[in-house]
């Protein structure tokens, strides 16, 4: 988070966004983070086979202005660009070259590469080990640039995938795990009333669209659709 400290569309060209990068940021292996990595990472995300390609479909070109300034030019003004970039993760170009992961692998085809099991980020936690569908272990990054901004007492994180929601809840209640997401609706009361546990909730800013078949069945009748609309409690 916050690898860019400033960003804005250029006053004379709304199709170009300029990003100022945070300085003195290093990857987990000690390599410096700079604009070359941003250009590489976004071009990699736009490559064929990338799951992130659609989010950057409006991008025409990514250019390094200097070591800590990047321009992103789009095909026409795109006010959603900054929001879409929050889903992008930076990859150290040198690390990618050294480990032959310059291009993304095709997850849909079951392909794997070095980056499937390894990573070299800039964040608060660095990867210790990863076993797909079993366990991923992270440890605190002692050189994290944001330690003074985002203080944390957590030194280790262990992710344990549990497919069954009932099993996840049981693991939480027994103390096998410390946190789960999301708590099934039917278990909110039981979890919330258990000593030492707390259910966290927050409002979401999103739209859920319900489409109805207006060509066949009961909803083909305009009156039914109007009744459904009236029945919604908008309060």
Locations of regions flagged by a protein language model:
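Gly/Pro-rich hinge or "lid" segments in bacterial periplasmic/extracellular proteins
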Residues: 89-151
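Alpha-helical secondary-structure segments
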Residues: 34-41, 67-73, 123-124, 153-156, ...
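Ligand-site clamp/hinge motif
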Residues: 22, 113, 143-190, 218, ...
